[in-house]
């Protein structure tokens, strides 16, 4: 596994300047004051648009000058392989040209639409656009992997699940979300539900793969049944590899016989038991991602693309808006 500084793992300076003022549809992206400087620092260290990482010897290795993705325009990418994950979710592996890496900053997402804008529209006749967070690492060469759950009422997910190997999907990005910096926090809590695991997985794999990481992570991951747990083997492999840095807690609404973990909805008691206290102040960060109802209950509703006011159980427990981020 490669070890590299978080500040050198980003896209080019010009891409970030554009991405900071663009959204994935018609709205602007979140304008947190700290986001742009951190992203630009990563691009600036790399020089004039050159991406590099540090290998195990500490030597910088230049790999490519820019990401094959475009934060301003949709580009078609060929579907290389489909790997079924469970009864309603599959991994969609897209081919990146010239064996290039995506170079996505952490945390960020992509937005997708049909390669034929006329093929997937909403009731107002506008192309349907949806955000997804890749599960493949930014340095992965030649491939970009999306883990996508099929929803009966989700036209975008049904369209993607209808694709065949060799078809294309229009992708735009990256869309910067939270500029995660290794060792910025002592404790990080990741509260996720269902397919909301992907941005949380992006953060924890990025951090734990860095040999200098000292942050302790706790993932509280809720699902309906055990069969619904996405990335289960990957998460358990992380827990086994980093037992002192990663605590994994599953929570099920419909547990099997003999289940010993938490059950039902995420409660105040469960959060008090597993999440680092608000009294740690700037040393703790809580990331939340899941169905809108769950996010609202845990941390308050989002306001469109903006964070919205902090609410829910986390507010009751004394956390502040600076301590919580909602994907």
Predicted regions and their residues:
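Structural motif
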Residues: 187-189, 285
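Reductase modules of NAD(P)H-dependent flavoproteins
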Residues: 26-32, 36-53, 220-327
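Hydrophobic/small residue at the entry helix of a nucleotide-binding pocket
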Residues: 195-200, 294
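Ferredoxin-reductase
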Residues: 63-167, 223-225, 253-254
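A short, basic/flexible loop-to-alpha-helix module at the beginning of a structural domain
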Residues: 174-184
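Short hydrophobic alpha-helical membrane-entry/anchor segments
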Residues: 48-64
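Histidine-anchored nucleotide/phosphate-binding helix
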Residues: 201-211
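N-terminal mitochondrial targeting presequence
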Residues: 1-36
């Amino acid at each position: 596994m490669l070890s590299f500084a978080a500040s050198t793992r980003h896209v080019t300076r010009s891409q970030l300047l554009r991405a900071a003022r663009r959204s994935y549809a018609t709205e602007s992206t979140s304008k947190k004051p700290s986001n742009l400087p951190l992203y630009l620092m990563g691009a600036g260290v790399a020089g004039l648009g050159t991406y590099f990482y540090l290998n195990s010897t500490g030597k910088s290795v230049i790999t490519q000058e820019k990401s094959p993705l475009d934060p301003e325009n949709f580009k078609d990418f060929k579907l290389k392989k489909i790997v079924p994950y469970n009864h309603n979710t599959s991994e969609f592996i897209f081919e990146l040209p010239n064996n290039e890496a995506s170079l996505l900053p952490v945390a960020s997402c992509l937005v997708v639409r049909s390669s034929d804008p006329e093929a997937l529209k909403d009731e107002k006749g506008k192309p349907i656009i949806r955000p997804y967070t890749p599960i493949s690492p930014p340095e992965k060469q030649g491939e970009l992997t999306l883990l996508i759950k099929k929803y009966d009422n989700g036209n975008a997910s049904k369209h993607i699940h209808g694709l065949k190997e060799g078809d294309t999907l229009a992708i735009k990005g990256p869309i910067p979300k939270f500029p995660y910096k290794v060792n910025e926090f002592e404790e990080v809590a990741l509260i996720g539900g269902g397919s909301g695991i992907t941005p949380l997985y992006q953060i924890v794999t990025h951090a734990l793969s860095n040999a200098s990481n000292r942050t302790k992570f706790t993932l509280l991951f809720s699902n309906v049944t055990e069969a619904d747990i996405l990335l289960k083997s990957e998460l358990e492999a992380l827990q086994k590899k980093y037992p002192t840095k990663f605590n994994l807690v599953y929570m099920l609404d419909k547990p099997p016989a003999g289940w010993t973990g938490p059950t039902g909805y995420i409660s105040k008691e469960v959060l008090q038991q597993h999440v680092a206290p608000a009294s740690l102040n700037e040393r703790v960060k809580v990331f939340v991602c899941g169905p809108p109802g769950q996010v609202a209950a845990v941390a308050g509703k989002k306001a469109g693309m903006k964070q919205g006011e902090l609410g829910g159980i986390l507010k009751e427990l004394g956390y502040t808006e600076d301590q919580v981020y909602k994907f």
